Structures are given as structure tokens and as C-alpha cells.
């Protein structure tokens, strides 16, 4: 609720509403879940908003200050379900729980905010997407450069980058896909992020350099940031400091799970801008969905940790051939073992996120059960990994470890089927603590004691309707039919009269009740104490657990890539430091999986003497698919995957640029032509001789002569200035004359067979130029009226004969 909506005069409000408004004023930009018994209730604008977002009933909570109070609520026991929906919608929530009664007359219950949930700071399993990272980011801009920091609290990951342009920043935001973004109040490039769900303007004080420097050193117990490579990098220090401060305040605690700070050197991976990622459909298709993407085909990992890691790899293919070759060697070595390894890895739980909750001390009893079951399978995993002759797999195996001490503790300390929450008890296993077992035995034996007492009194008083019952309000009580009340002894104290029965209490029963309830309370307190001690015992192992989780993730990815290589008939690529790309009988990794007929394979050869390939041919003839498959194969090779080709040699690639029109987003008001020119300008300014450039139909959207002129001049610039490896498709036949004027250009085409107004595509690339574009024949496939097509044919003949 905004401040203007908080009433100026508090005197006309009920005590409860006064309390609510006071708490709400502390969290004006969040939905306040205000506990009222078994419900969380929301009032005023919060009620209206949650009603609209979740489609729940909007009602009223009487009147206050002479006005109706809009109200909506959700049951406490179902709150996680609603919170999950709100977080996905980009909402932040403050959870306000009841504490105790502070005013005996008015019975106003004390309440306080015990938990803050924002999209970028959640760690609860039910609020997280299983196969996605959950980053929160902060941006600082200075001198047209940016400091960019990301943190995933659920994994304990903290990273920073220095970014040199707004275009690169947009690319990095697309790559990391943060659920929440912090930016300073003077940020001039808000347009870059305003379309995202959860962006937060922060005070410049939160980006203060000195404060940020101190916060980072305090987090890592250091006196300098030299060890992280950012000592004099003020941009990233400001961004990281703001982010760390914000996450701490939202989490209401220290962040012991944040043990490292990774400096992301942009030059370590192949650069792909926003347009490239979108048009290649790596992890999201054009519609923003996950189906029919490279990830959908490659990602058959069996753990959520592995799934997240593979998507990270796909978004950051490496230029470091040593790491890539290690991965290729591992994928090859795993080919005889992937089935049995995947069988075991399916039993591995999300140790990466469990580690983080352990460090934050928010791990649930079920987290301990999942960790126990994961640690139990490690010996069998080691037995298989020891058979594999690979230095990299051996390194992974050693990082996985065994954790016998932790496993022994969890077997002894945690019940086989504990309750969901420690406050419900039943978490600590029997025989772990003698005192706890004794306290529990009182509760267990109470049923027998009550049964014996009931039978004894029933027999003594000869009352057939005599029963002993229990409820939370009055505790144990004796219930007797009214027709037998004349048989009741004087020491029976009546406590409740109902229609047909009366309820009584006796001193002996009350004393026993106190003993049982006291034992339950002591048992729960002891169980909580023992539970906290388990965290203390495990704490020294946390760093190794985190390393083990990362190693298990990588193993899952490599085993998955090995399975994909065999199942999809992929080939190990040769990675070369030399210039060029050579692919024989290559296939599109996504398209081939959805065809009912065999995919038509095509080759490509790019070298210093053949830097540009100009492709002509009909629409739908295979030009765009061909270009995309080359880029996707480069990406696959760069993450350590085998590739869909009979032979593949991949040279050193530093950047991939695409300009393919189907990825256009015209919502910002630019025309398709303007979008094309802006993207081409970006390519010409940033592509190098080691860049792969894919351009589809350059020069559309303006007159034929102007379009051809621009396509001609841009192509010559790419050939002679950028010297990039370029594939360019076109319908301008005149553009193919570049082959005669530039020695680095080669013409290729896709052909088709036409009969009457119908067309059959061959999808095979060949040397030379396509003599026709077959536009009218392709148009016939869209269902245009025959008369329109016939008229078009006549006009075409007329134009060609002019």
C-alpha cells in the first residue's frame, strides 16, 4: 500500500487495523500476508491486487475509519501454493505471523514480519523452478560501462562482470535471466530492463563504493579484493555490494552459503548477443517456450542440478579448448557406461540447493532425508567411475567424495519418515538420544494408561457410557450420558454440559495430562536442540558438499551428452586453433528430431580463402535452417558435446552474430528495416575475423535498388574489414556477382523442382546460383486463390520481358 493510502488519522481505526497499517508502512511495495488464526489475510490495495492476480474472492472486513475494508485471504496450510504462484508473477511478499497475546482485555495479538519472499531471494524448494537458476542481479553504470552482479541464493553462487556496452549488458541479462533486478535511481538505461517482471529502483547510497568494499571484505573475511580480481574494478564492486546488502536484508540473516565470488571474464566464452540467442532458439524458442529448442533436444539429464548446469553451458559455449577437449574426451569415455550411471544418478537429489539451505540453516527434515539417500548411492557410483580411464572423470570422482561421517550421522539421527517441519516433532530417530526416548515413551504409554484408567473407573462406578476423551481446548475429560449423572462421585468436577452428555474432570486425570503435555513440550524443545546440533556437526563438511554437488552436476551433464551422442548419431568434433569451419554431412540438431522423413545432410567449408558464402534459393528451401545448424553445431562443440555431422572441424570462434528476421520484436516502435539496420550496424562494429556471422536476406524493407546497394556494401565490409566467417542468404541475384569481384566469396544455392504452380524443395546445397526464387510457387502453398496466382504469373512474365 502506498503511503498516500495509509490513513492520516489512526484514532478512528480498530486496534487490529492500526497494527496492520503500521506493519504495512514498513513494506509498502510488498504484499503483506497478515496472520489471522488459520488464515493469512490481506487488506485494502493488497487484497484487491491478490484477488486480481490469483482469481480469489474479494470480500470485506467490516469497516474502519468509516470505510469498507477490502479483504482477501488464503489458508495458512495452503500458503506455499499461493506464494509460489505470486513469486512466478514477480511479486514480493512479507509474511507477518502471530506471536502472543499482549493485551488481556482487548486480546490484541502481537504480530511481526518473520519472513520476506522476493522472486530473486527464495530458497524454499516449493518456490523454485527445479531446472532453472534463480538469479537476482544488480547493475551499476558509469562512463557508459556497466558493473553487473548476479547471485543465486538457492545455490550459493555469486558472480560479477564488467560490461562495455548496453548491447552486451542486454546479452548478459538474457543469458543469466534474473528473476529480480536492482538498479540505481539515476540509471539512464531503464528501457533495457523495463519489460522484465521484477525491477527495483534503489538509493544511490546502496551502491556506495566504500560501503560496498567493506561489505564484500566482511563477507569473505578478507582485507582486499585482489584475490577475486576486482580490487580496482569499482563498477563491479558497487553492483556486488548493493546486491549483497539487499539479499542480506531480505533474508534477515548472514549469508554463510556465499563462499566464493566469481569474476566472469566475458572473453572466456563465445559471445552471443540477445538477437543471436533468440534467433538460434538455444533454451527458448521465438515464443518464449522451451519446446523445439536445442536444450529440449540435448537436455535429457536425470538430475535437476545437471539440467541447470547444461543450460548454463549452452548459454556460454567456451573458447578454452583445453576444457572443451577434456569434456569431449569424457563424453567418449562414458559411452560404455552411460546406462548404469544414469540409473544411479536418477537417485541423486538436488544436493546443490540442499547445501545452500544447510548453510542458511533453513534445511527441512526432508532435505536431510534426500541428502541421506543421495550419500547412500555414492559408493556404487564410485565403483563404476573407477572403471573409466579418463583423467577428467577421475578428477570428478575425487570431487564427489564419500561423506561416510555425514551419512552415519544422518542414519542415526534422522527418522526414516520424519515430519515435514521440526516444529511438528517426530524428526529425530529413536535411540539417538536417551532423554528424548524417555520423554516420548510417556506420550506413547499415555494411551495405555488412559485406557486402563477408563476401564477401572467404568467398572468401579458401573457406568456404561463412561468414556475418556481429549481435545486441544479442554484437554483430557470424562464424558458421561446425562442419564447416569446420579452415579457421579462428588470429587468429579463438571466442566461442560451438552445436550445429552456432561463432561467432567478429576485431579488424577489433570495431573497425568500435565505430565503428558509437559513431556511433549520438553520432547519438542529437546528435538529442536538436537536438530540444531546436526547443523553444527555438518557445518565443517559444507564446502566439500558444495564441491560434490558441482561434480555430480557435471557428471550428469557429461553422461547425458554421451547418451545423446549415441542415441542421435553424433560425431566427436575436432577443435582447432586455426581459422575456419569444416562440416561434412551436417544436420540441424532440432529439426531432424521432428521430421518424419530423413534429414537432408549438407556440408560447409569456411576458411581464410573462402570467408563468405552467399546462398540463393526459394523461401522454405532450407537456407535459414542451413545457416542456423552451422551456428548450433559450433555451440554444441563449444560446450563439450558431440555434433550432428559425419566430420566436424571447428576453428577458434570468438563471437556468433545472427540477423534473421523471424526474431524481430517490433514492440519498441522500430520498423523491421530499422531493426535490421541497427543489428547489421552492431555486427559491423563488433565482428572480428574469428566471428561467425549469419545474415538472412539483408536489405529487405526498402526499395530494391537501395536494399541491394546496402547489402552489397555491408557484404564488402564484412569481407575486407571484419574478415569474418559469413553466411549470407539473399534474393538479390545481383549480389552473387561479388564472387567475381571478391576472391573470398563463394556462391551456393538451394534448388527446387517446379511443376505448374506447385513446387518440391530439394533441401540440398549446391555450388552456383539459383536462377529463380520461386516466390509465386511458394505463395501457392499458403492457400492464395488460383486467380491471384495466375495473375501474378502473367505479371511476372510481363516484367521479365520488359
UniProtKB/Swiss-Prot annotation:
One GO biological-process annotation of the entry reads: mismatch repair
- Give the matching InterPro entries: DNA_mismatch_repair_MutS, DNA_mismatch_repair_MutS-lik_N, DNA_mismatch_repair_MutS/MSH, DNA_mismatch_repair_MutS_C, DNA_mismatch_repair_MutS_clamp, DNA_mismatch_repair_MutS_core, DNA_mismatch_repair_MutS_N, DNA_mismatch_repair_MutS_sf
Q: Which UniProt keywords apply?
A: ATP-binding, DNA damage, DNA repair, DNA-binding, Nucleotide-binding
Name the positions where ATP binds. Answer: 617-624
- Gene3D superfamilies xrefs: 1.10.1420.10, DNA repair protein MutS, domain I, MutS, connector domain, P-loop containing nucleotide triphosphate hydrolases
GO annotation, cellular component aspect: cytosol
Q: Which Gene Ontology molecular function entries are recorded, alphabetically?
A: ATP binding; ATP-dependent DNA damage sensor activity; damaged DNA binding; mismatched DNA binding
- Spell out the family assignment given in the record's similarity comment: Belongs to the DNA mismatch repair MutS family.
- Chain's role: This protein is involved in the repair of mismatches in DNA. It is possible that it carries out the mismatch recognition step. This protein has a weak ATPase activity.
Write the protein's name: DNA mismatch repair protein MutS
**Organism from which the protein derives:** Buchnera aphidicola subsp. Acyrthosiphon pisum (strain APS) (Acyrthosiphon pisum symbiotic bacterium)
Gene of origin?
mutS
Amino acid at each position: 500500500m502506498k503511503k498516500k493510502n495509509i490513513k492520516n488519522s489512526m484514532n478512528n481505526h480498530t486496534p487490529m487495523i492500526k497494527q496492520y497499517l503500521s506493519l504495512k508502512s514498513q513494506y509498502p511495495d510488498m504484499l503483506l500476508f497478515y496472520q489471522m488464526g488459520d488464515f493469512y489475510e490481506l487488506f485494502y490495495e493488497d487484497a484487491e491486487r491478490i484477488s486480481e492476480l490469483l482469481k480469489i474472492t474479494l470480500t470485506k472486513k467490516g469497516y474502519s475509519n468509516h470505510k469498507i475494508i477490502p479483504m482477501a485471504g488464503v489458508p495458512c496450510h495452503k500458503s506455499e501454493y499461493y506464494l509460489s504462484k505470486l513469486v512466478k508473477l514477480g511479486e514480493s511478499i512479507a509474511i507477518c505471523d502471530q506471536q502472543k497475546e499482549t493485551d488481556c482485555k482487548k486480546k490484541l495479538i502481537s504480530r511481526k514480519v518473520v519472513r520476506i519472499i522476493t522472486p530473486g531471494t527464495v530458497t524454499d524448494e516449493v518456490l523454485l523452478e527445479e531446472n532453472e537458476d534463480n538469479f537476482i542481479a544488480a547493475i551499476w553504470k558509469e562512463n557508459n560501462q556497466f558493473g553487473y552482479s548476479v547471485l543465486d541464493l538457492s545455490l550459493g553462487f555469486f558472480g560479477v562482470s564488467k560490461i562495455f556496452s548496453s548491447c552486451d549488458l542486454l546479452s548478459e541479462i538474457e543469458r543469466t535471466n534474473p528473476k529480480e533486478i536492482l538498479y540505481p535511481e539515476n540509471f539512464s538505461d531503464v528501457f533495457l530492463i523495463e519489460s522484465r517482471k521484477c525491477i527495483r529502483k534503489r538509493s544511490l547510497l546502496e551502491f556506495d563504493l566504500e560501503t560496498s568494499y567493506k561489505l564484500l571484505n566482511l563477507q569473505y573475511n578478507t582485507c582486499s579484493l585482489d584475490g577475486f580480481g576486482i580490487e580496482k574494478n569499482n563498477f563491479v564492486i558497487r553492483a556486488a555490494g548493493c546486491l549483497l546488502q539487499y539479499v542480506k536484508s531480505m533474508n534477515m540473516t548472514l549469508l554463510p552459503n556465499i563462499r566464493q565470488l566469481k569474476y566472469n571474464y566475458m572473453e572466456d566464452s563465445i559471445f552471443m548477443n540477445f538477437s543471436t540467442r533468440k534467433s538460434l532458439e538455444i533454451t527458448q524458442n521465438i515464443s518464449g517456450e522451451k519446446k523445439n529448442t536445442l536444450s529440449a533436444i540435448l537436455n535429457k539429464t536425470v538430475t535437476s542440478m545437471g539440467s541447470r548446469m547444461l543450460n548454463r553451458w549452452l548459454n556460454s559455449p567456451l573458447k578454452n579448448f583445453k576444457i572443451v577437449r577434456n569434456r569431449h574426451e569424457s563424453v567418449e569415455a562414458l559411452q560404455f557406461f552411460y546406462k548404469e550411471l544414469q540409473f544411479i544418478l536418477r537417485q541423486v537429489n538436488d544436493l546443490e540447493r540442499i547445501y545452500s539451505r544447510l548453510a542458511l540453516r533453513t534445511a527441512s527434515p526432508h532435505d536431510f532425508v534426500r541428502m541421506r539417500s543421495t550419500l547412500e548411492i555414492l559408493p556404487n557410483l564410485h565403483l563404476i567411475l573407477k572403471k573409466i580411464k579418463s583423467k577428467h572423470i577421475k578428477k570428478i570422482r575425487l570431487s564427489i567424495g564419500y561423506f561416510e561421517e555425514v551419512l552415519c550421522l544422518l542414519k542415526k539421527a534422522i527418522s526414516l519418515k520424519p515430519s515435514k517441519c521440526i516444529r511438528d516433532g517426530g524428526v529425530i530417530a529413536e535411540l539417538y538420544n536417551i532423554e528424548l526416548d524417555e520423554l516420548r515413551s510417556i506420550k506413547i504409554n499415555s494411551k495405555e494408561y488412559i485406557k486402563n484408567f477408563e476401564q477401572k473407573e467404568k467398572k468401579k462406578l458401573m457406568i456404561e457410557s463412561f468414556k475418556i476423551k481429549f481435545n486441544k481446548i479442554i484437554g483430557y475429560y470424562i464424558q458421561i450420558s446425562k442419564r447416569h449423572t446420579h452415579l457421579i462421585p462428588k470429587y468429579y468436577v463438571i466442566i461442560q454440559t451438552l445436550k445429552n452428555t456432561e463432561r467432567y474432570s478429576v485431579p488424577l486425570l489433570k495431573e497425568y495430562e500435565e505430565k503428558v503435555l509437559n513431556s511433549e513440550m520438553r520432547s519438542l524443545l529437546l528435538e529442536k536442540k538436537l536438530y540444531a546440533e546436526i547443523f553444527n556437526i555438518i557445518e565443517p563438511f559444507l564446502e566439500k558438499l558444495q564441491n560434490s554437488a558441482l561434480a555430480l552436476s557435471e557428471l550428469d551433464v557429461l553422461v547425458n551428452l554421451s547418451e545423446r551422442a549415441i542415441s542421435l548419431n553424433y560425431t566427436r568434433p575436432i577443435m582447432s586453433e586455426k581459422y575456419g569451419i569444416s562440416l561434412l554431412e551436417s544436420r540441424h540438431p532440432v529439426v531432424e528430431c521432428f521430421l518424419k522423413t530423413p534429414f537432408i545432410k549438407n556440408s560447409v567449408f569456411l576458411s581464410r580463402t573462402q570467408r563468405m558464402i552467399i546462398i540463393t534459393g526459394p523461401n522454405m528451401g532450407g537456407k535459414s535452417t542451413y545457416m542456423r545448424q552451422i551456428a548450433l553445431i559450433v555451440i554444441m562443440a563449444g560446450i563439450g558435446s558431440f555434433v550432428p555431422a559425419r566430420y566436424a572441424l571447428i576453428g577458434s570462434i570468438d563471437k556468433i552474430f545472427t540477423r534473421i528476421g523471424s526474431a524481430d520484436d517490433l514492440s519498441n516502435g522500430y520498423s523491421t528495416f530499422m531493426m535490421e539496420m541497427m543489428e547489421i550496424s552492431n555486427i559491423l562494429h563488433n565482428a572480428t575475423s574469428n566471428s561467425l556471422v549469419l545474415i538472412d536476406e539483408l536489405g529487405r524493407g526498402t526499395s530494391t535498388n537501395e536494399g541491394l546497394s546496402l547489402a552489397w556494401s555491408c557484404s564488402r565490409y564484412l569481407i575486407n574489414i571484419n574478415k569474418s566467417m559469413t553466411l549470407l542468404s539473399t534474393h538479390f541475384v545481383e549480389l552473387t556477382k561479388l564472387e567475381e569481384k571478391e576472391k573470398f566469396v563463394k556462391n551456393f544455392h538451394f534448388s527446387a523442382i517446379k511443376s505448374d504452380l506447385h513446387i518440391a524443395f530439394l533441401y540440398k546445397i549446391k555450388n552456383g546460383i539459383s536462377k529463380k526464387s520461386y516466390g509465386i510457387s511458394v505463395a501457392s502453398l499458403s492457400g492464395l486463390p488460383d486467380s491471384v496466382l495466375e495473375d501474378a504469373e502473367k505479371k511476372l512474365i510481363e516484367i521479365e520481358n520488359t
